[in-house]
Amino acid sequence: MTIPTSISGFPRIGRDRELKKAIEAYWKGNATLDDVRETGRELRVRHWRLEKDAGIDLIPSNDFSLYDQMLDTAVLLNVIPARYRRLGFDNPEETLFAMARGYQGERGDVTALPMKKWFTTNYHYLVPEFDSSTEVRLNGTKPFDEYLEAKSLGIETKPVLIGPYTFLKLSRDAEAQELTIDEGLVDAVADVYAEVLRRFAKLGAQWVQLDEPYLVLDKHEGDVSLFKSLYSRLLPARDSGVRVLLNTYFGNIADIYETVKLFEFDGVGLDLIEGRDENLKAVEHHGVAARTTLFAGVVNGRNIWRNNYAESIALVEALQQVTANVAVASACSLLHVPFSTKGEEQLGDKVLRHFAFAVEKLEEVREIADLMQLDDDAKRQSTALAANQALFDGSRVVADEVVRARIAALADADYVRRPERGERQRLQREALGLPLLPTTTIGSFPQTKQVRAERARLRKGEISQGQYDEFIRRQIDDVVAKQEQIGLDVLVHGEFERNDMVEYFGQNLNGFLFTKNAWVQSYGTRCVKPPIIWGDVSRAQPITVAWSSYAQSRTAKPMKGMLTGPVTILNWSWPREDITHEEQTKQLALAIRDEVLDLEKAGIRIIQIDEAALREKLPLRESDWHREYLDWAIPAFRLVHSAVQPSTQIHTHMCYSEFNDIISDIDAMDADVISFEASRGDLVVLDAIHDAHFETEAGPGVYDIHSPRIPSVEETEERIGESLAKMDVNKVWINPDCGLKTRGNDETWPSLTHMVQAAKAMRANLD
């Protein structure tokens, strides 16, 4: 019996980030919208052919997006807030970009939709927003156009959409924020999906994939009935001849599997990486509907290590004990891994053979399915299976005994800072002499073409290290002078020497590997190139001390030392799979601790340890939060800073996340000051800070740096006022949402000037 193969989705940015380059050229006025459309078409065609040639049977379509798949779904359902409609753009792409980035120009001035992390990944989605004008209906033809585009090439695809349950659970109300999901809304949304199924049936589609990752979360009152209501109304549209694959990922659906089974979906996608044990038990206990094919998600779409074929085969065989209808699939979309290992030959074959990026994962899916066709004797004789097993026999790296000994010697006292925070705050106010509502930035300043060009010249050997260092010193001189000129209270050196907040540190730590082109989409056109944790981690030498010391010598104002924290380095790297995340984080924490103490010795009085990604990997089910994550992630941060003097002020920063539910754990990090990325979330974190009697001083971001908009002084004053209404004035800091690296100077300096003016005005009112 032939075993079908499937993937949930494929990276959309292109092997060389062609999509990013085309869209950004359009935004800068250097390309037309037709150029962007043509680039998109070329990428889709290239990827479909690649997937077909790799032997994938159920090839996805509509997994492509110019910005974000949730945003595309909102547009498809006509969930377009009135403020964007009023802009009156002639083409849907401009409206979509305004929703994603905001708009400031002759047509008006509107903020962007909120942006949040996509479950536990580093991908960000735009939050669909319902307002009083919303009329849910089918809008546009994107999914159908892309299906027909593939069909014209002779490629049959499986259209992919975000499912209605996930779409509604991740949406919000423009006014109340929490969306009221009443019967009328459920029916309207389900009817659109039913119409989509019928249209695809008329076009000849055999399968439609509905992604429902929200099913892996804890179920609250009304959740199961919502799922039932949606699918009871839309599934009869299958009668038109199309099959429906309910696809889940990022965890298990054990608590709703029995309900899912009753609907007799044509296919059910199960994550057998992150939800392995629970999903297997659910299938074994409840069985499988006769018409249902189980899509066994055995190829990891979230890490870059080679698949262990023997383990994957065992998982598929376990499902085959329950049903003969099994397909081999990716555990989630391959959106979250780089394009291909081709072009990374500098790593050497002995290293590279351990990695599989998106293209190689297509081959893994096909190869596992092929191996499943063999009998036991043929499997034992399979050279492919033997070659794969050789990757997992024995140890890949030699342990660093010095690092292991440091970890073994850690005691409880190493995780505790003295004295308590209240006493430290008093000492720090005396030492630093800052005003009420102190102003600062998160760390990075715009990296211009010139900065990137000089870094490239150094890499190519066209300039010496000394010439490059002199260039960086001039950049620091300039940014320090400008910060003083506009009146910021706590300064930063701008991070011009850093290509990336994680990769830069990895390049100065033992145990890391780096790629040339392994880019992954984070949001829109923003891409990241995570380093790879290959072996045990330790600090090779001081990393930031020289630049921070130089910057401090250029000003009498406090200069922040800027570091990336251990949990964020782990979460924004490709972590090892041969030792635990906890062990890797302790290694990183000790390395960054060494850097913190060296900065303090060099006279840096404020040290920021960014934990931008702390919330990102919080398990999706609350019962797992502490046991599987927070019980080691929070102490790891404390380990980094526990040995500094009481007068040294420790800052941290966190990016797009939901903080409300772990606000007490964040307080337990025992930082002195924390800045939150909050402006796109309407500062809802303020309620959590207030209700939890949050002790850490805090700076909820007062403007959104992911949008090119320049906020007015009045707008910023309003934001500050919202903070003051919920927080102790002595604990409020004023700062942007995030680092300014990706913005332009033309946006950055006016925005910061307005921020400082707003802070001074509010300060004067307090006096």
Curated annotation (Swiss-Prot):
Organism superkingdom: Bacteria
Cited InterPro entries: Cbl-indep_Met_Synth_N, Cobalamin-indep_Met_synthase, Met_Synth_C/arc, UROD/MetE-like_sf
Cofactor requirements of the protein: Zn(2+)
Pathway given in the UniProt record: Amino-acid biosynthesis; L-methionine biosynthesis via de novo pathway; L-methionine from L-homocysteine (MetE route): step 1/1
UniProt: L-methionine binding residues: 442-444, 495, 610
EC primary class: transferase
Pfam families: Meth_synt_1 (PF08267), Meth_synt_2 (PF01717)
GO biological process: methionine biosynthetic process; methylation
Keyword Chloroplast annotated: no
Catalytic activity: 5-methyltetrahydropteroyltri-L-glutamate + L-homocysteine = tetrahydropteroyltri-L-glutamate + L-methionine
Record's keyword annotation contains Ribosomal protein: no
Cofactor note: Binds 1 zinc ion per subunit.
GO molecular function: 5-methyltetrahydropteroyltriglutamate-homocysteine S-methyltransferase activity; zinc ion binding
Alphabetically ordered keywords of this record: Amino-acid biosynthesis, Metal-binding, Methionine biosynthesis, Methyltransferase, Repeat, Transferase, Zinc
Chain positions recorded as 5-methyltetrahydropteroyltri-L-glutamate binding sites: 17-20, 117, 526-527, 572, 616
Binding of Zn(2+), residues: 653, 655, 677, 738
Binding of L-homocysteine, residues: 442-444, 495, 610
Known EC number: 2.1.1.14
Active site: 706 (proton donor)
Family note: Belongs to the vitamin-B12 independent methionine synthase family.
Role according to the record: Catalyzes the transfer of a methyl group from 5-methyltetrahydrofolate to homocysteine resulting in methionine formation.
Protein known as: 5-methyltetrahydropteroyltriglutamate--homocysteine methyltransferase
Organism: Bifidobacterium animalis subsp. lactis (strain AD011)
Taxonomic path: Bacteria, Bacillati, Actinomycetota, Actinomycetes, Bifidobacteriales
